[in-house]
Amino acid sequence: MTRTRLLAAVVAFAMPVAAVAAGPVLMHRDPGCPCCEKWAQQVKAQFGRAVRVVDDANRPAFMKARGVPADLASCHTAIIDGITFEGHVPIADMKRALATHPKGVTGLAVAGMPMGSPGMEMPGMKTQPYDVVAFGPGGRKVFAHH
């Protein structure tokens, strides 16, 4: 682990939750998607605030407006403190992005719905490996691998 990553992890976990996510949590989802509810419950528990859920039949337009690359699409898009989180992004990765605000990054995404990612946990099912991808005007890069 690089010193920068270690420092970012320490900062992310040492900060009070309220300082990490000062603004409201807004989540647009495909209407009626149950895994989005599971993910929102985890966000609520970890950030200590309600998640405003919007059933959005026109979510692709919302995603495009937020700069989410089409190939990174999932079933929900959340906004916290101006950062976009597409799909089943783990809470620890969200906290790290919110604490460090990586230069040129406007959001994080987990493409699709990988088994075992937050909200997609199912007893007896094998966890699939997946990447959390940081995206922004300058392109994209892997932010974390799970």
Predicted regions and their residues:
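Stable alpha-helical elements in mature extracytoplasmic
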Residues: G32, W39, D55-N58, P90-M94
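Thiol/selenol-based redox catalytic cores and closely related redox-interacting motifs
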Residues: K64-A65, D71-H146
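Short active-site oxyanion
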Residues: P24-V25, R49-A50, D81-T84
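Twin-arginine (Tat) signal peptide motif
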Residues: M1-L7
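Bacterial N-terminal signal peptides
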Residues: A8-A18
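Short coil/loop linkers at secondary-structure junctions
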Residues: A50, V68-P69
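Conserved helix-turn-beta segment immediately C-terminal to the redox Cys motif
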Residues: A40-P60
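Local sequence-structure signature of Cys/Sec-based thiol-disulfide redox active-site neighborhoods
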Residues: A21-A45
